[in-house]
Each structure stands twice: as structure tokens, then as C-alpha cells.
Regions:
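Glycine-rich phosphate-binding loop signature in dinucleotide/nucleotide-binding domains
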Residues: 84-85, 171-178
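Acidic, low-complexity terminal tails and accessory targeting/binding regions
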Residues: 27-41, 120-131, 178, 194-239
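Short glycine/proline- and acidic residue-enriched helix-loop micro-motifs
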Residues: 138-159
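Bacterial N-terminal signal peptides
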Residues: 11-22
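N-terminal export leaders
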Residues: 1-10
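Phosphate-coordination/substrate-recognition cap region in phosphate-metabolizing enzymes
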Residues: 37-40, 76-141, 207-209
Length: 239
């Protein structure tokens, strides 16, 4: 069951969409790390700023690319949004574009870079510009969401999800309560939401997050997880 409502008063005058998402019908609830029943963990989930490869619609995956000028401006905007938030910890992947975004946005908290939060290795498609060749694009679109397909020497969704879950388990053991920031990647963040919200592959594959969009997930407290998506005033037309 999903409920949606508008919430005001977010960081820097942003507007949030609140999605209250329960476990899928018939699903078995997963046990969180041991914590008091009233403990709540708030996870701010950002995507890294834009890179040249993002602008070119090129699959960068495990390639270690850096922010471009637009990406640095997006990271500065993220810092402004988060200016009033105290973080107990900040996590990034160990790819430069994620670390650079976290360094600009973190507000002085040391950054813990985890390889398990890295983007998926897209195998034979890494570096491919989606749409540049119709046959290759069709093959990629056909294969990318199949959970067991490693894309010819890359990484399957199942393998990627296993390491993302491993990262989250460690993070939640270290922080059963409090407020943390994770700066990840487009697909990595899909899988973080899949794990925290108990989503199916179909539902998690449908999630999109632009380079300048921010989620906040609240887990614990003896209730179903809740998800907010902050959208800056200039993006309200997209609602």
C-alpha cells in the first residue's frame, strides 16, 4: 500500500513528496539491526552530481569519472539544502564522482567511502552511449533489468544488490538511530530503496533519481518505512 501527500518545510524551502510504503502483500518483513522499538534512523539519500558521461548519456558504471561544472554546482545546491541538518555519519562510494559530491555537501563530517556502494559494472555496455546504436541499445534495454544477467563480464543486479545490502547492514549496525547521509549512484540508490522499503525488482527498477534530487527515508520506530523526495521550487512543474 502506498500513500502520497505533500509536505512543506523541508531543507532550503523545498517541497517534499511523502510516500508511506508498507511491505508488499504476502511478503515477510525483514529484521533490522537490534535497536529499541522507538529508535528511528533517518537516511538522506543523494545521487552524485553530473559528470561529462552523464551529460553524454554514456554508461559509466564502475568507471571512475569526476564531476563536471554542472555537477559541482549541483553538489553546492545539495550542501545548501542540507545546511540545517546535523549528520551523525556520511557515506559515499569510493568512486570519485560520489566522493566529490559528498566532500562538497557533507558539512564537515568525515566521509566513510565504501566500495560496496559503487555503481554497477555494466560489462560489455560500459562506456556505451545509450541510443547511439539501435541494435546495441535494444540489447542493453532487454538485458539490463534481468536480475541474473552479468552483461558479459560485468555484474548482475543480484550481485550488485548483495553488496549494497552488505553495506546497508553494516551502516545500520553502526547507526541503529540518528541521521546519516549516503551519496550514491543511480542504480545503487534504486537498490538501497529496494532493500529498505521491501520492493520487488519491478518496482525498484522503475525508480529514477536525477543528479540533483534527494530522498529521505525514515526506518524504525515500530512502523513501516517512510520515504520523502525533496523537489526544489524550480522543479514543481514536474509534479
Amino acid at each position: 500500500m502506498t500513500r502520497v501527500r505533500m509536505v512543506t518545510g523541508g531543507p532550503a524551502g523545498a517541497v517534499a513528496i511523502l510516500l508511506a510504503i508498507g511491505a508488499p502483500s504476502g511478503a515477510t518483513a525483514k529484521k533490522a539491526a537490534p535497536a529499541p522499538a522507538t529508535a528511528v534512523l533517518r537516511i538522506y539519500l543523494a545521487r552524485h552530481g553530473q559528470t561529462d558521461w552523464n551529460a553524454e548519456h554514456r554508461l559509466q558504471g564502475a568507471n571512475d569519472t569526476h564531476l563536471n561544472g554542472t555537477g559541482r554546482a549541483q553538489a553546492e545546491k545539495l550542501a545548501a539544502r542540507l545546511a540545517g541538518v546535523h549528520f551523525d555519519a556520511v557515506y559515499s562510494s569510493n568512486l570519485a564522482r560520489s566522493r566529490e559530491t559528498a566532500e562538497i555537501a557533507h558539512g564537515g563530517v568525515p566521509i566513510d567511502s565504501l566500495a560496496d556502494l559503487n555503481e554497477r559494472d555494466f560489462g560489455k555496455f560500459q562506456g556505451f552511449v545509450v541510443g547511439s546504436d539501435s541494435a546495441t541499445t535494444a540489447e542493453y534495454e532487454r538485458r539490463k533489468d534481468a536480475p541474473g544477467d552479468d552483461l558479459d563480464g560485468g555484474e548482475s543486479l543480484e550481485q550488485h544488490f548483495a553488496r549494497v545490502r552488505r553495506a546497508l547492514e553494516g551502516i545500520r549496525r553502526a547507526h541503529p538511530t540518528g541521521t546519516i547521509l549516503i551519496v550514491g549512484h543511480g542504480l545503487t540508490n534504486q537498490l538501497i530503496l529496494r532493500d529498505l522499503l521491501g520492493l520487488t525488482w519491478e518496482k525498484s527498477n522503475a525508480i529514477s533519481q536525477a543528479n540533483d534530487e534527494l530522498y529521505m527515508i525514515e526506518v524504525g520506530g515500530g512502523r513501516a518505512p517512510r520515504l520523502w523526495k525533496w523537489i526544489g521550487p524550480e522543479n514543481l512543474k514536474d509534479l
